């Protein structure tokens, strides 16, 4: 009888150990992850040592993490130059690739190694994922019993240099706050290229000062719903656009999260919104009626590439963007 009960007990213990490893849910999955015994307990306050770096950029990365941590948990992190007193250590390791990092969480301390600010930033995103979900969500809670981390050793580096996400705002306008939220989510998942689709047949979303009608006319259409099949235009005035000030603000916001913004401008096709704004030199037939498109799909009302003025328009739009 004892033997019969002993074998299931061994299997149960083994399954619990496997489950512990499975519970370390990180996205993207690190290249190497080892789970150890014990947990790192935060307490109400702790000290951190941050390696010096040009422009103090590593410290700025950590200050952003500190702010998020305190807002969600109330835990205060102060600085120290003495490693023996530090419970969080950010240490330079020149041997690591630019976006790579090592993260070692033990019962006594959290140690992060990287060679560039981006590596430290990605390590801190992983650290947030190891914490309770409300930290990722930025939602405050007073239950300090939750504030601990599993003991782990992680070595990680991206498989791909270009890790992109595309958002189509030509067809539907989302606005500045939503774009920042998208950038926040990209940063959590260590994506680094935001493909921002800003023009389409159905709308032009970026201010071009040399061609103001692109947003005065091209940013607006007479239906929120795009017609398709049995779905008809609803007649609602709909649209929006970003000023150049908005664009600069969003670019700066993304840069702090190591995300490069790639603006997408469709020329000569997918351009009916632009044609509607300047039919006199963009349209293949200026005598036709041209309006911002109300349909799903792709319009055949394209920019006339045989017109030198249209080619000059394309050049000047790109020049103003850059």
Spans of model-derived segments:
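Contiguous, structured surface segment used for ligand recognition
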Residues: 22-160
């Amino acid at each position: 009888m004892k033997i019969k009960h002993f074998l299931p007990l061994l299997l149960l213990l083994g399954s619990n150990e496997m489950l512990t490893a499975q519970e370390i849910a990180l996205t993207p999955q690190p290249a190497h992850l080892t789970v150890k015994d014990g947990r790192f307990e935060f307490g109400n306050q702790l000290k951190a040592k941050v390696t010096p770096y040009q422009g103090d950029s590593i410290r700025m990365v950590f200050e952003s993490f500190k702010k998020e941590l305190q807002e969600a948990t109330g835990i205060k992190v102060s600085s120290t130059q003495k490693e023996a007193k530090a419970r969080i250590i950010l240490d330079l390791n020149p041997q690591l690739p630019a976006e790579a990092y090592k993260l070692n969480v033990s019962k006594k301390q959290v140690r992060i190694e990287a060679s560039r600010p981006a590596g430290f930033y990605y390590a801190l995103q992983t650290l947030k994922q190891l914490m309770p979900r409300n930290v990722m969500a930025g939602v405050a809670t007073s239950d300090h019993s939750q504030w601990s981390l599993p003991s782990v050793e992680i070595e990680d580096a991206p498989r791909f240099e270009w890790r992109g996400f595309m958002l189509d705002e030509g067809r539907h306008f989302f606005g500045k706050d939503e774009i920042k939220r998208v950038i926040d989510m990209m940063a959590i998942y260590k994506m680094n290229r935001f493909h921002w689709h800003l023009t389409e047949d159905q709308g032009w979303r970026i201010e071009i000062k040399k061609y103001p009608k692109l947003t005065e006319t091209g940013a607006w259409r007479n239906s929120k719903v795009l017609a398709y099949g049995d779905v008809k235009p609803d007649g609602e005035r709909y649209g929006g656009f970003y000023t150049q000030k908005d664009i600069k603000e969003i670019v700066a916001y993304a840069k702090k999260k190591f995300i490069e913004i790639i603006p997408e401008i469709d020329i000569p096709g997918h351009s009916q919104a632009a044609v509607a704004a300047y039919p006199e030199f963009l349209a293949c037939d200026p005598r036709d009626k041209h309006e911002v498109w109300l349909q799903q799909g792709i319009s055949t009302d394209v920019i006339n590439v045989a017109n030198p003025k249209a080619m000059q328009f394309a050049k000047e739009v790109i020049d103003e963007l850059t």
